[in-house]
């Protein structure tokens, strides 16, 4: 090698090292100014979490957040996280269009969800969000109400066998109902999960979320080569085979149906009203045929994402809601009275007007999501330095939000651990900071399916309340939940059911 070239390369490398070291030191100085929890080398703040039982981890986290609120620095491995809990700081982050990228933790989902709407960033996220958004147009959601109703009627019928039999576990019933709904509305396919009972897909998705939750909580499992040496990897691999097989089968069946019926959306469908009951999958398939805006891999990733977000989160929300109604018979009866006033003893399918008139039931649902948000953590990554709460947050820092902690702020919600639907009376909502309640996140990267989820819950609950009374067996203190991706109770929720007629 020419000596001049060698010296030039040496100088370049030397300067790069100096710049990197200088920037790293500057970053450390910025972070040291932020109040933080005790941290250890390599593992960071994770040790106190790891040696606690799963059911005690959230309690410890809430104690730390309470001590340092509204802003705290902690480390997972060598990665800095800044947790924020005041609505004012949350608004700064969630409204910032430069802070819409998800943190590195979401990379752990890539083997399953790829880079779908939940995990993607940059141009891909913007393109996919634009393609998918019309799927949740008002008139399309209205067309799904009959499907919500059909599956709710099956749930009512299935629960009949539990009448008079004592305590039973509710989660599997609502989980199968949610799976039936998401498959038919989003994929255009009936899987009959409620009638056929056991669902290999539901079992696989539950095991997969357990694996990913444990991996996210343990920085030692972040490196892929270490993860592959553990039993977690083999569980992950088996589950992925089931999940991919299930979703690929749905996609192929839908493609065949479209070929046979030749029913596709085209640019001639200018009237949005014509798009009623258009499955989410059809929107993706249309986009793949329209100048190849989406590849087959894109479709697989988005279907996985929608199935996960539209099934697990809704079934968790409905389970917790029944837990609360079973603990508060007076609230349950008030919701029943509202439903009865609307239906007048009829078992008919609700209309959109009916659902819009379920004001009390909507407050009940929102209050349940306040105490038991389906997703308990959101994390964003800063790609450039920015100011937050009087501190400079350096690029590369992860910004995280504990949704239950935010929702239980006594300065915003009096008696925050008490279930009180009046928290969502119009006069209280209008006087509350808009970022004090974020069960579906907020800002430009909020949950695209939140309206879908609320309508689904209203329909299902309107059927259940017309037919049954529920009483919760679990004690109030059993409302503790695990540190997992989806809000899961420490003790599975048991109910006693009584027929109204």
Curated annotation (Swiss-Prot):
Catalytic activity: an organic molecule + reduced [NADPH--hemoprotein reductase] + O2 = an alcohol + oxidized [NADPH--hemoprotein reductase] + H2O + H(+)
EC number per UniProt: 1.14.14.1
Alphabetic keyword roster: Endoplasmic reticulum, Heme, Iron, Membrane, Metal-binding, Microsome, Monooxygenase, Oxidoreductase
PROSITE patterns: CYTOCHROME_P450
Positions of heme binding: 309, 447
Main enzyme class: oxidoreductase
Family: Belongs to the cytochrome P450 family.
Protein name: Cytochrome P450 4c21
Stored PANTHER family: CYTOCHROME P450 4C3-RELATED (PTHR24291:SF189), CYTOCHROME P450 FAMILY 4 (PTHR24291)
Gene Ontology CC: endoplasmic reticulum membrane
UniProt keyword GTP-binding present: no
Localization (cell): Endoplasmic reticulum membrane; Microsome membrane
KW Manganese (keyword) present: no
Membrane topology qualifier: Peripheral membrane protein
Listed InterPro entries: Cyt_P450, Cyt_P450_CS, Cyt_P450_E_grp-I, Cyt_P450_sf, Cytochrome_P450_Monoox
GO molecular function: heme binding; iron ion binding; oxidoreductase activity, acting on paired donors, with incorporation or reduction of molecular oxygen, reduced flavin or flavoprotein as one donor, and incorporation of one atom of oxygen
Cofactors required: heme
